[in-house]
Amino acid sequence: MQHFKIITAIFALSSSLVFSQNYKTSSTAKSEQGFPKVDTNGKAVFQVYFPEAKSVVLEGGDGMQNLKTEIAKRDNGFWKITTSALEIGFHYYWFNVDGKRTNDPNTELYFGYGQPTSGIEIPSGEDFFSDKNVKHGKIVDDSLDSNVTHGKRNFKVYLPPNYESKKFPVLYLYHGTGEDITGWEKQGYIKNILDNLFADKKATEMIVVMDYGVALSPEQEKLPDDYPRTVVSTKNLDKIVVQELMPYIEKKYKTNGQKAIAGLSRGSYQAMYIGSNHPELFSAIGSFSPVIYEGTELQPFKELPIDKLLKSKQKPFFFLGIGEKEDKRFFGYNDLLTTFLSQNKYPYSQYKSAGTYHEWLTWRRCLYEFAPKLFK
């Protein structure tokens, strides 16, 4: 009997060591939490305490579809969920606990899908967004009172490592639907990406303004859901950027007058709208996972003044980026844009992110490709 106990103890210790060697705690886990864990093949293990639950199901965003999971409830009230290999990159996720959407208490929360949401990072083997031993910039919070939306608007500003030494160009950068101004900082790792690019002399140092992508007045907030709210919001945003935000930034921060604009998903539409409407103000327009709103088959650019680019003297450089595994509708928007630009011999570049979905690894890579092309 004693011999059996020793063998059992050795087996348990051995299993623990194998588990710890093959799996590492996700970078999104809270400090001192051991889960979720990810192995070298992208398989994940979640352990959550829902003692009264009868059903716990793992759910998530684009990169977590079609997952195979093994779910087991233990006598101590913990549920263990093991998955098949996940796609690389950052994924939003949550648990369906007896029909109720519930975040993982083990992870940091990220604003996605219109609410605080759990996240997991599946390593891609890249380090361009890692926190390296380089000179660091900083991100500050700021705000202004808008006469367009009749309220306070918050935004974040990235200041480059050598901010105190001279004046800098400015990139205005937008998040996507269901996200907010924290997206580029938390999920996007913008600070690490730019710090590393600047340290390697691969991009011109710049200020980045991460503005809020919703711009509706209190009255417009009451518009029905089937109303083209995004177009209304974008037209308001156009006024805010040109009449309020830019003058504010140029007065308060050390800017040199050069500007570019970019965004992801809905933010791509906003960047294209504002950039196309004011081509004289921007040297480049970046569209990451492009979206076009309220277009028709005959008039795909009905609510996007992209034809103004053709008449402009400055002709801002146009950048398009998309994930290889994104939904076909995003490729449809992308193709409409590349066809238009090619037919009109307008300068642009196309980037495709290998193996990624409509998610943050795509957009991190887009920024990494886009930033070195700016302010040359």
Show where each model-derived region lies.
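A general sequence property marking short-to-moderate contiguous segments
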Residues: S20-E32
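Non-catalytic cap/lid and distal C-terminal segments of serine-dependent acyl enzymes
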Residues: Y23-S26, D39-K68, K73-K376
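Short beta-strand segments of immunoglobulin-like
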Residues: Q33-V38
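Bacterial Sec-dependent N-terminal signal peptides
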Residues: M1-N22
